[in-house]
Curated annotation (Swiss-Prot):
The protein's name in its UniProt record: 5-dehydro-4-deoxyglucarate dehydratase
Keyword Lyase applies: yes
GO molecular function list: 4-hydroxy-tetrahydrodipicolinate synthase activity; 5-dehydro-4-deoxyglucarate dehydratase activity
Keyword Lyase (UniProt): yes
Pfam families for the chain: DHDPS
Length: 303
């Protein structure tokens, strides 16, 4: 798949990031990971991002990364495109991106480089080096220490034909509008704030109708229903799901740092698709929080 074909796919529909399955010892569990992908693929997501943030990319070893991407690509071939997460130091991000390309992924999501602050010039150099190390499409994730402005993205768009997308996990409306207006149709734009459904209607109004859903991992039907409601401007359905599910869900998620991933694994466990524990430094939900989440999920009905 060439970068422009991938860009077209990512320009509409719902996206998601499968959890990474671990056993009780914290080791990658390939068989249930494959079954997870087989379960999720038919629900209609435009693309799935393997070993992304929700997939605990930041906790994976290189050998595990290769196995995860291979399982994802092999399992979903002909069903749904797989993009791989990559990130960290520039040379590591390059190595992972090249490995993902070798294994047949359709593209990569470039996560932040972590820890150190960087100038716009440094961020441009980092992203440019990753883009030029591969032929397939690259989506850059604006989040944490990687906050590219419109000037920097314009430079990258000119220098890197395979930079096809910009995912926003910052939520700076002025910056997002500036980037969207400046870059126009050169990139595809993805909403990427945690629990993106809460912000979906606002991002759609800015010209960013596509977003990634974490809750797709355990309530895929509801996630797709919500996306369609936003797309069709069914404000009644959007408001009801936000009030009945997403705001109470946020109340649980916001109780502890790192729960953005933990609560998704908890949800998967509750619906019978257990992905195992999160890896340290993340922590799993407490028993009473599991009960509260279970009650929210049951109100939604069958998935």
């Amino acid at each position: 798949m060439n970068p422009q074909e991938l860009k077209s796919i990512l320009s509409e529909g719902l996206l998601s990031f499968p959890l990474t399955d671990f056993d009780v010892a914290g080791d990658f569990r390939a068989d249930t990971y494959a079954k997870r992908l087989e379960w999720l693929a038919p629900y209609g997501a435009s693309a799935l991002f393997a070993a992304g943030g929700t997939g605990e990319f930041f906790s994976l070893q290189a050998s595990e990364y290769s196995e995860i991407i291979k399982v994802a690509v092999d399992t979903c071939r002909g069903e749904v495109p797989i993009l791989a997460g990559t990130g960290g130091p520039t040379r590591q991000a390059i190595a992972y991106a090249q490995e993902a390309e070798r294994l047949g992924a359709a593209g990569v999501l470039l996560l932040p480089h972590y820890l150190t602050e960087a100038s716009q010039e440094g961020l441009v150099s980092h992203v440019e080096q990753v883009c030029k190390s591969v032929d397939f499409g690259v989506v850059v994730y604006n989040r944490n220490v990687c906050r590219l402005n419109a000037d920097s993205l314009e430079k990258l768009a000119d220098r890197c034909p395979n930079l096809i997308g910009f995912k926003d996990g910052v939520g700076d409306i002025e910056s997002m509008v500036s980037i969207r207006r400046r870059l126009g149709e050169r990139l595809t734009y993805l909403g990427g704030l945690p629990t993106a459904e809460v912000y979906a209607a606002a991002y759609k109004a800015m010209g960013v109708p596509v977003y990634s859903s974490a809750v797709f991992n355990f309530i895929p039907k509801t996630a797709m229903d919500f996306y369609r409601a936003v797309a069709s401007e069914d404000h009644e359905t959007v408001g009801k799901l936000i009030d009945d599910f997403f705001l109470p869900y946020l109340d649980i998620r916001n109780r502890c740092e790192g729960y953005g991933v933990s609560i998704v694994k908890a949800g998967a466990r509750l619906v019978g698709h257990d992905a195992g524990p999160v890896r340290a430094p993340l922590t799993d939900l407490l028993p009473n929080e599991m009960e509260q989440l279970d009650a929210l999920i049951k109100k939604l009905g069958a998935q």
